[in-house]
Amino acid sequence: MSLLEQLDKNIAASGGLIVSCQPVPGSPLDKPEIVAAMALAAEQAGAVAVRIEGIDNLRMTRSLVSVPIIGIIKRDLDDSPVRITPFLDDVDALAQAGAAIIAVDGTARQRPVAVEALLARIHHHHLLAMADCSSVDDGLACQRLGADIIGTTMSGYTTPDTPEEPDLPLVKALHDAGCRVIAEGRYNSPALAAEAIRYGAWAVTVGSAITRLEHICGWYNDALKKAAS
């Protein structure tokens, strides 16, 4: 059974939750052993996969969990806005560290390495390639280039203003165009995640609402302050 077939089976049985275990940088939780513990807890709670950033975090997580890991490396580049897995060496390192799926930025922006080359390198390692996209055009272009999975990860993050709500219309448009879609980005409640499935998502990635304690506390603090004013 292929990984995609196994994921199809697990998603049908468990609902399609993927947990992104990426603590706020510099947080007390930003340690490989804590990231791995969060990933294991997510697996035990029914997540069908986890999304992990960084080689040390990935290696530690791989030693604990049995679910597939979506691996990424984030970089801040001087000459490109692309942050997610921008280099071929990043793909190689993620493959060696145990990722089953490698995600790359799939937007049509200036970048050090073409998307096509990154996807080909992932497939060279016999792994699944995921493209983190911001629009229908991005998604369809990446699908034509061979991406196995299209994520809505970058929707709202390539423009000056980021909306509060997730981009459900993008999920539907990509699904209707024949893409295998992972909905990602601002799915901060079970209701929104469920809506993504209704719009055609194959699975839904949730990060901040599960694994970023500072964000969750901020939401509660803001609501309590408003109630008290």
UniProtKB/Swiss-Prot annotation:
UniProt KW keywords: Carbohydrate metabolism, Isomerase
Record-stated family: Belongs to the NanE family.
Top-level EC class: isomerase
GO annotation, cellular component aspect: cytosol
Coiled coil: none
Lineage: Bacteria, Pseudomonadati, Pseudomonadota, Gammaproteobacteria, Enterobacterales
EC number: 5.1.3.9
An MF annotation (GO) of this entry: N-acylglucosamine-6-phosphate 2-epimerase activity
Family annotation (Pfam families): NanE
GO BP terms: carbohydrate metabolic process; N-acetylmannosamine catabolic process; N-acetylneuraminate catabolic process
PANTHER family, per the entry: N-ACETYLMANNOSAMINE-6-PHOSPHATE 2-EPIMERASE-RELATED
Pathway field: Amino-sugar metabolism; N-acetylneuraminate degradation; D-fructose 6-phosphate from N-acetylneuraminate: step 3/5
Cited Gene3D superfamilies: Aldolase class I (3.20.20.70)
Gene behind this protein: nanE
HAMAP family for this protein: ManNAc6P_epimer
Catalytic activity: an N-acyl-D-glucosamine 6-phosphate = an N-acyl-D-mannosamine 6-phosphate
Name of the molecule in the record: Putative N-acetylmannosamine-6-phosphate 2-epimerase
Species in which this protein is naturally found: Salmonella agona (strain SL483)
InterPro entries: Aldolase_TIM, NanE, RibuloseP-bd_barrel
Protein task: Converts N-acetylmannosamine-6-phosphate (ManNAc-6-P) to N-acetylglucosamine-6-phosphate (GlcNAc-6-P).
